Amino acid sequence: MGKSVVVLGAQWGDEGKGKIVDLLTDRVKYVVRYQGGHNAGHTLIINGEKTVLRLIPSGILHNNVTCLIGNGVVLSPSALMQEMGELESRGINVRERLLISEACPLIMPYHVAMDHAREAALGNNKIGTTGRGIGPAYEDKVARRGLRVSDLFNKEKFAAKLKNVLDYYNFQLVQYYKAEPVDYQKTLDDVMAIADIILGMVADISTILDTARKNGDNILFEGAQGAMLDIDHGTYPFVTSSNTTAGGVATGAGFGPRNIDYVLGIIKAYCTRVGGGPFTTELFDETGAEIARKGNEFGAVTGRPRRCGWFDAVAIRRAIQVNSISGFCMTKLDVLDGFDEVKICVGYKLPSGEVVDYAPLSAKDWEGVEPVYESMPGWKENTFGVTDYNKLPAAVHNYVKRIEQVTGVPVAILSTGPDRVETMILQDPFKQ
């Protein structure tokens, strides 16, 4: 009997999902992206070679795996071609192993232009988007004016639809945002030049997945961003534009929710966040700077520095609740080496003085919230690259066990370095 496992970020993204997906991929036949776009960078280091994937599932580096892009993903044709080119230049046959839903909305140049114009207009109050047109593309999907992959099958109708939607965008860009318009002919020519390549990879993703499940094949769903950035359940409005939670698998890949066997939540041993928004445990002192330096906390796609703080069990409880997380994979454990003490946030102190163990839903309700910490002894030993749990310091064991206790979720996998071999699998998600 095959297993279907969801791998998703349980914090604010950048938890190390790419490595873990790559690690587990040798157990599966299919790896599926179901939400987001090319705004998420999944960094893989294999035999010392670094690969950053933004759109194509991380399983593409395994020859026996078929990669699927579900309807919940917003697809940038130019980003797809660039990523395919980079992989094919290294001898990886992408076109025979990548299948794309025809229902994927297309990210077009006017989406990117609108993204930049809006962020510029917001000034200091900007959301902190990656500027890749993700949000505007999802807006078009909901407004039912968006272009989809399926529209490329009829090039004349595509050209007419493009003209209408581009007129709509250019009016806003020029009249309201005082920005430059997007050129129609160049936009059309650019997408038509690569349309047939994309259409050659179109498939019915939902049916493929249903057939795979019935055939007993293992399937891995690769989430992007993190649960606390979910458009509905994250720290709104400082969120992404898609459903980053496990429910996104059903809506974004056409896979029945009862068929999900295991949800693996990826967590760092501490917390990070990119861009604006609430971050209760954020550190503004030398400790925060040291975590950022040791963890090399800069965005894989944007290069932006990440905000760093102690592990937040309160925020994680919300992620557990919304995603039915079965087990954790804790990454970057080695970054905490050398600290005299480590802390876990176990409660939030509200402005009223009340201490609660749950996270607010909207950003405004986080205002004035203070962390309530438990302090634990740190460890001086070097844990980088350790692959035997019994060889970890006792203080590490205590830290991991305490996180399991305060969250109620077991740590199934521990990561002590960026390479796939620098990992301890304590519970295999595909054998549970």
UniProtKB/Swiss-Prot annotation:
The cross-references to InterPro entries, in alphabetical order and at most eight, read: Adenylosuccin_syn_GTP-bd, Adenylosuccin_syn_Lys_AS, Adenylosuccinate_synth_dom1, Adenylosuccinate_synth_dom2, Adenylosuccinate_synth_dom3, Adenylosuccinate_synthetase, P-loop_NTPase
Give one Pfam family, short name only.
Answer: Adenylsucc_synt
Q: What is its main location?
A: cytoplasm
Q: What class of enzyme is it?
A: ligase
- Positions bound to Mg(2+): D14, G41
Enumerate the subcellular locations listed in this protein's record, separating them with semicolons.
Cytoplasm
Recorded family membership: Belongs to the adenylosuccinate synthetase family.
Record-given protein name: Adenylosuccinate synthetase
Q: Whose protein is this, by species? A: Actinobacillus succinogenes (strain ATCC 55618 / DSM 22257 / CCUG 43843 / 130Z)
